[in-house]
Amino acid sequence: MAQPPPQLPPGWVAQWDPNAARQVFVETATGRTSWQPPTAGPAGVAPPQQHQQRPTHPQGQARMSMPQIQPPPGMRGPSLSPISQHGPGAPVSPPSAGSPAPASIGPGASRRRAYPTAHLAANSISYAGGYDASTATGAGVAYPGAQDAQPQLFTPGAPDLTPSPYGAAAQPALGAPGLAPAPGAHGAPGVGPAPGYAAGGVQGITNQFQAMGVGGGVAGGMGQKFSTLQTVNISGVQPNVNDLERPPPEIRLPPNACVSTNPKANADPSYQRCTLNAVPTTSSLLQKSKIPLGLILSPYRSVREADGDEPVPVVTDTVIARCRRCRTYINPYVTFIENGNRWKCCMCNISNEVPQLFDWNSETNQPADRWQRPELNHSVVEFIAPREYMVRPPQPPVYTFLIDVSYQAVNSGMVATAARTILETLDRLPNSDNRAKICIIGVDTSLHFFSITPEGTEPDMLVVSDLDDVFLPKPNDLLVNLTECRAGVEALLQRLGDMYKDSLVTGSALGAALQAAYKLISPIGGKIMVLTASLPSVGPGALKNREDPKLLGTAKESTLLGAASSFYKTFPIDCSRSQVSVDMFLFAPSYTDVATLSCLPRYTGGQTFFYPAFHAGRAEDAVKFSHEFSEVLASPISYEAVLRLRATKGIRATAFHGNFFVRSTDLLALPSVPLDQNYAIECEIEETINAPFVVFQSVVLHSTSSGERRIRVINLALPTTSSMSEVYANADQIAIATLLADKAVERSIHSRLEDARDALFNKLVDVFSTYKSTMTSAGSGASPQLAIAQNLAQLPLLVLALLKHVGIRQSSSIPSDLRAYAQALLTTLPAQQLIPYLHASFYCLHNMAPEAGTTVAEKGFVMPAKLNLTSERFERHGLYLIEDGQNIFLWVGREAVPQLCLDVFDVANYGTLRGGKTTLPKLDNSMNQRVNAIVQRIRDSRRGPYRPHLYIVKEDGEPSLRLWALSLLIEDRFEQSPSYMQFIGQLRDKVNGGS
C-alpha cells in the first residue's frame, strides 16, 4: 500500500515538478533541493559541502545543477532571467571549491552576494510550484512587488507615429478578449506591495521567501500568508476597465493542507469560485464585513482546445472512497493516517478506511501508486459510477421537437429554417451508440403527429384536435430510433418547410402539445425542444396578451415578470420528477410572454433563447438561429442529474439560484445540465470554524449520452481568517457581482424592480461604510475620498452596470419580453460571459494599432485597446465597436471619411451607408479584413452557443438603434440613471452620511 507523504522537518517544503511528474523537496532557507524526503535535523542547517546540487532525475538523467543562492527580494524563487553568456536551457555546474566568488553588483554589494541566474533559464523550478514556463521562454519575471501593476497584455513596443488614413494616430493594442492576463493567474502569486529587504540571517531569508509567496500555492509553504490589503481611493478616478479581466485574489492555503503538490488540486475559477477567497471563522465577522458568502459554479464548462483546456480526468476503476458520515468524496484535502490505511475527512474529521483496491491498477492487475490517482491530484474529476449509483440503467438521448406550424411561424421562415437545421445536425447529435430517439410534433390549434417506421420512408401525419384530453395515436411509431428510422426522419424534415406553406391558422395549443410530449417520453426522460412564434392561445396553458405600456416603469411592472398561469409552474415540476427538460426557442413577431414561458426551462434545467422580430428572409436572423440551435443540439448531454454541495462543518447552504428544481434542502434536480450554465449558492456560517481551511465540494451525479452513469466532483479549498483586513483583501468582485445579479433578478420577480435596485445600492453602501470605519483612518468622520480594497475597486462599476442593465434598469420603454429574457441571461450566464454582458467591451477601430486585428507570431490574435464606456471617446470621424456578447455595434461617426466607408463597408460615403442589422462584406483590403477578423474573434472567443448580431449604428441614424447602443456606455448619464462619476459621488455621500 502506498505510503502517505512524509512529515517534513522544519524549513522544508514539497513542490511539484511537472517535468518529472513527482515531488521535489526544497529547503526554503538555502534553496537546496532533493528528490528524497529530507531527514529530520536542525532547521536551516546546510550539509558540510559548499554547494548542494539539484537532485538527479528519477530515471538517472541529470536534470541541472543549482548553486546555493539567495534570491533578491521580490523575485519568485529562482525563476530569474538568464545571463547572456549562457543560452537558454544550458545547465551550469556549481563552481569548484577554489573558484572565485561572483562579482559584486551595485552599491553595498560587498555586503551581499550576487545572484547567479544563468543555470535557471531553461528548467527553473519555481518556488510557487513547478517549472516556470515564462522564464524558460525568456519572458519577464513575475513578482508580487509591483504595486499598481496592470494585466500584462500584449502592447507593441514602439508606437506607430504614422498618421492613420482615417483619423488620429494609432493606439496601442491589447491582447484578445477572453485571454487571461499573465500576472496573477490562478494559482500564481498575486499582485501586492513590493516587499522590503528582509532581515539578515536565516530568518530574514525565510521572510523573503514568505513575501515572495513561496508555498502560497496549493500546498502552502513556510507559513500561511494572505493577499496584502491595498486601499485605493476611487473618488474622481476613472475606472480601469482592464481590471475586470484580472484573476481573483490568490488562494493561499496553510502548509500541508493538501496531500498533493499538483497545482491543479484546487478548482479553477471557471468551474467554481467563491465570493471570499479567505473565509471568516465566525458568522459575526462575515456579517460585519457585509460581503455575502456564496459560490459561483459552472460544473459543465465547455472544454476548448483552442483555449488550452484539458479534459476532466476520469476515474475508471469504479473505486470510490467516501466518508461514512457526511458522504464526502475523497479529495486532495483529506489526511491519511495510520500508515495510510485510513483517511480523515476534511469536512467532518471522522476517520474512514481506505478501500482495498485504492492502490491497485485494475487494468494491469499490478499495485498502483496512490499519489498518482486523479482524485488526489485534481480539483475537478469524474468517476464512472457503479450500479449502486443507478436507480435504473442510463436511458438513451431523447429529442422531442414541438414546432409551431401556425401562420406566423411559417410566414417568418422559422419552420423551414428549423427543419433544415435539424436535418443538417443529425450527424452531430450525441448518438455514439445508436440509441438516440427522436420525435417531431407540429403545433397550431391542433397537434400534428408524424408516424415513422423503419421500413417506410414516407411519414404519416396524424392530427389530434381534442386538446382537453390529449391522446397519442400510434405511440410506438411517434418516438423512434434515429438510426433505424433515419430515412423517414430525413424525408419528414425535407418536406416540413413546405407542408404548411398555405396554412392560415393563427392560434397555438402549446400547452396541449407539452402534455402530449410529456406523456410520450416521461417513462424514459429526455429533452422537449419548443420552437414557437405564437402566444399559446387555446387549450391548457392558454395565455393572454398582458403587455400594458402603462405599467412599464411603475411599481406594478414586476407583475409582468412572473408567470401568468400556474400551468407553467406545475408542469415543469412534473417534468423534473420524470427527468424531462424543456428548452425554449421563442420567435416574437409580437408579444410572446417570455416571462411565463421561460419558467419551463427554469425549473427543468433547460435554456431559453429569444429572437425578437425574427424573419428568415434576413440572412442574419437565419444564421444566428441556425448556429445557436445546432450548437445546442450537438452539445454533449448530461441528464438525469442531481447536484449537491457539501462544505466543512460550520458552513451551510441557504439559497440557490439558476435553472433547476430544489428537491430537498440541499439537493438540486436537473433533468439536463447544459454546457456553460451557471449556478449560484448562498452560504452562511452556522458555528465558529476552528479549521485552518475549509473545503467546498460540489457533486453532480448524471448520465451521459453514451450510457454511462458518472459523478463529477469539484473541490475548492479556501483558508480561514479571523482578520477583517484579510477578508477584504481576498474578496472576489467578479463572484460578488455575479451573486448580486442573481439576487437582484429574484428580488425583482418576487417583489419590485425598485426594491431590487435599492438592494443593490444599499449593499454597496454597506460594504464601503464598513470598510471606511474599520480599515481607514477616517473612521466615522466625513471624508472626500471613497476608499476600498484594490481588489474591490471595480465593484461599484459592476453594480452600476447592473443597475443600468435592461434586466434591472428603471425605464418605461423596455418591453417586458426583452426584460424577462435579459433576466434569464443574468441568472444563467457563467461569470466569464456575464461580466461582458453587464460591462460591454468598447474599441476604437479607425486608428487602431497596425497589428490589431491580425495574428502575430508568438503573440496570437491582437485586439485593439479597450476603452472606457463613455461617449467622451467618440470622434465624429471615427469607427467604434461596442459588444456585450449578445450584440455587436459598429458606431460610425457622421464625419467618417469616404475612404473608411469604402474600405470597411464598400459604400462610397457616409450618406449611402445603411444602418441596422447587417453582415460585413469581405473585401480585398487590410482594414476590412482586420475589422472582419475582430468581429469573428469576438464571436469565437467566448464559451456558449450564442452568436451575437452585428448592427451598423450611424451617429445621426435611427434613434431607437442609436439609443440602444448608447445605453451600453454605462459611464455616461442615460435616462434617469446617473453617470459613473455621479454614482460614485452619491455613494460617497451616502457612506459619509451613514458614518
Swiss-Prot record:
TM annotation in the entry: none
SUPFAM superfamilies found in the cross-reference section: beta-sandwich domain of Sec23/24, C-terminal, gelsolin-like domain of Sec23/24, Helical domain of Sec23/24, vWA-like, WW domain, Zn-finger domain of Sec23/24
Disordered, as annotated region: 25-112, 150-172
WW domain ranges (all copies): 6-40
Comp. bias intervals (Low complexity): 36-61, 87-109
Molecular function via GO: SNARE binding; zinc ion binding
Key word Zinc present: yes
Pfam families hit by this protein: Gelsolin, Sec23_BS, Sec23_helical, Sec23_trunk, WW, zf-Sec23_Sec24
Gene3D superfamilies named in the record: 2.20.70.10, beta-sandwich domain of Sec23/24, Sec23/Sec24 helical domain, Severin, von Willebrand factor, type A domain, Zn-finger domain of Sec23/24
Region (Zinc finger-like): 323-348
InterPro entries membership: ADF-H/Gelsolin-like_dom_sf, Gelsolin-like_dom, Gelsolin-like_dom_sf, Sec23/24_helical_dom, Sec23/24_helical_dom_sf, Sec23/24_trunk_dom, Sec23_24_beta_S, SEC23_SEC24_subfamily
Membrane topology annotation: Peripheral membrane protein
Cell location: Cytoplasm; Cytoplasmic vesicle, COPII-coated vesicle membrane; Endoplasmic reticulum membrane; Golgi apparatus membrane
GO biological process, one term: COPII-coated vesicle cargo loading
Entry GO terms, CC: COPII vesicle coat; endoplasmic reticulum exit site; endoplasmic reticulum membrane; Golgi membrane
Alphabetically ordered keywords of this record: Cytoplasm, Cytoplasmic vesicle, Endoplasmic reticulum, ER-Golgi transport, Golgi apparatus, Membrane, Metal-binding, Protein transport, Transport, Zinc
Binding residue positions for Zn(2+): 323, 326, 345, 348
Function: Component of the coat protein complex II (COPII) which promotes the formation of transport vesicles from the endoplasmic reticulum (ER). The coat has two main functions, the physical deformation of the endoplasmic reticulum membrane into vesicles and the selection of cargo molecules.
Protein family: Belongs to the SEC23/SEC24 family. SEC24 subfamily.
Subunit structure, as described in the record: The COPII coat is composed of at least 5 proteins: the SEC23/24 complex, the SEC13/31 complex, and the protein SAR1. Golgi apparatus membrane; Peripheral membrane protein; Cytoplasmic side.
Name recorded for this polypeptide: Protein transport protein SEC24
Source species: Mycosarcoma maydis (Corn smut fungus)
Gene: SEC24
